């Protein structure tokens, strides 16, 4: 994708085969042993801006004995298997680079793709497949809605690691940024461990509201979310001056947006004032 005047070929995009190979190798590993392959998850950002990349999971990866995406997930428990795939797709969609996902993988088709037959649409009658399909629909809508997820794909200003060294926990966290400076805080966990009161550094002091969580019940998760706005405190973490405590879903992704003043907090404060005023009158 380099400019022809600079010796490049001048294509609009290039498939990121390095990311694809590392990512699929990482995802195929047992979650309990992924910490030994943590570098495969983070290495792609070292060369992410050397080309205009597309993150690609093509038909080549779901044929000829390579297994469909859902069957690349190593878990035997079906709930965990689909949770893992939701985390994988969430990471893919929040990682810099355009996206290519082959048909059928968006609803978790169990069989490999075969060019002589149609997709197994009947699998959408299964609850797990149907909820993954809904998840992908919402993930695509989020991607389309949030410029931070695509505007600066090929500019280093659009991405910033918060933590890319938590190998033991197998958690990565980072910021995606839009041209106007709007930021999204992304946290992804690749182990089946629910982590409550998990401390994470934030780009700046303020209030952080969760806008997306793969652990929602409508997607097949347990419903353990970050329903309340997290207010940062001046406590150093991840080489950041300010931090928040969150619930990190097992095999999942959660995304936060910094908000100026949450409506729920405003209502709660107004309610407290009213109660105090009534007590004073009495």
Regions found by a protein language model. Give the residues of each.
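Aromatic-lined glycan-binding groove of carbohydrate-active enzymes
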Residues: 28-70
């Amino acid at each position: 994708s380099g400019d022809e005047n600079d010796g490049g070929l001048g294509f609009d995009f290039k498939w990121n085969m390095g990311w694809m190979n590392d990512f699929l190798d990482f995802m195929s590993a047992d979650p309990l042993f992924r910490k030994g392959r943590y570098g495969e998850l983070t290495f792609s950002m070292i060369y992410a801006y050397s080309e205009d990349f597309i993150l690609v999971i093509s038909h080549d990866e779901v044929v000829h004995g390579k297994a469909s995406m859902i069957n690349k997930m190593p878990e035997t428990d079906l709930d965990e298997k689909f949770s893992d795939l939701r985390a994988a797709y969430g990471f893919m969609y929040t990682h810099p680079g355009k996206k290519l996902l082959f048909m059928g993988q968006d609803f978790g088709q169990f069989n490999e793709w075969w060019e002589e037959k149609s997709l197994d649409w009947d699998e959408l009658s299964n609850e797990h497949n149907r909820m993954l399909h809904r998840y992908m629909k919402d993930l695509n809508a989020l991607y389309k809605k949030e410029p931070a997820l695509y505007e600066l794909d090929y500019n280093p200003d659009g991405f910033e690691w918060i933590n890319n060294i938590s190998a033991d926990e197998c958690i990565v966290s980072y910021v995606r940024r839009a041209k106007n400076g709007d930021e999204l805080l992304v946290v992804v966990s690749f182990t089946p461990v629910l982590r409550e009161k998990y401390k994470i550094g934030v780009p700046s002091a303020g209030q952080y509201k969760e806008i997306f969580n793969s652990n929602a019940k409508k997607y097949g998760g347990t419903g353990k979310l970050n329903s309340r706005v997290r207010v940062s405190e001046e406590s150093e973490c991840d080489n950041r001056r300010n931090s928040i405590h969150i619930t990190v879903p097992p095999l999942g992704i959660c995304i936060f947006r910094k908000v100026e003043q949450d409506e729920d907090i405003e209502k709660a404060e107004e309610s407290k004032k009213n109660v105090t005023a009534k007590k004073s009158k009495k």
